[in-house]
Amino acid sequence: MEHAPLPLKDVFHLSPPRDRPSLAFPLGLGDAGLHEICEASHGDFAAMTGFALAARAHRKGPIVWIRQAGLKQSHGLLLQAGYREISTNISPCLTITPRKLSETLWATEEAIRSGVAALVIAELEDTDFTASRRLALAAGRHGVPVLLLMPYSRDGATAASARWRISPRPSSPNRYDPKAPGALCWKAVLERSRQAPHMAGQSFDLELDDETLSLRVVSGLAADPVATRPSWAQDRIGPSHLRQSA
């Protein structure tokens, strides 16, 4: 007995293609998953905060900002005036200041699981692989992007999608007044990347677009190796209008 061949479309049911994370800058930062953003040197915390706010994807909904008390004393608080100068989307922001690292990690995970936050930002003194994995799994499960802001001493293994190392750069020339400061600029080094490991060590020269308040790459992708960070660090002057002393 002969059987007529079945069309392939009746045999195989192809699933729709899954969205893959973009391999272009900033690799999904603030849009999906867990990203670490770290100082390149001591004193870069204000510049690092500005980078995080400018580079993040703009999602509707409140931000939960968790700040470990020790970092609040060392690096100050976020100024709303500076926030408005660097971001077009001024979302409602709930600030939490736990005292201990363990409390900060717990609050971060609870914020992810709350179902309320569109973005969770946590300032931590440090973390380990196990804690970062818990946060990464929670971020993926609940679809909430997470940014961890950490000092220059951060090192070691991580479960984050990427680790960025941020330093300020001299502002670009002001086209209206050559004696006045121009747009804010940063250097961002992709120190680690799970979705694009071949890009680890690449650096981006970035500038804040004053009209759109978004970051643009001004010199393309450079194949600079990650510089070895010294045990001591030279103080830098970041965008001082962004944070104030506690």
Where are these regions (language model features)?
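Detector for small/aliphatic-rich hydrophobic stretches
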Residues: 1-65, 69, 76, 82-91, ...
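Long, charge-dense
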Residues: 66-127, 142, 150-155
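A contiguous pocket-lining binding segment that forms or flanks enzyme active sites
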Residues: 118-177
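A broad, low-specificity signal marking well-ordered, structured residues that form hydrophobic/aromatic
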Residues: 35, 164, 188
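A short acidic, amphipathic alpha-helical/loop segment
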Residues: 48-52, 107, 131-135, 139
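Solvent-exposed alpha-helices and their adjacent loops that cap or buttress functional pockets
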Residues: 29, 112-113, 140, 156, ...
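C-terminal functional extensions of proteins
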Residues: 170-246
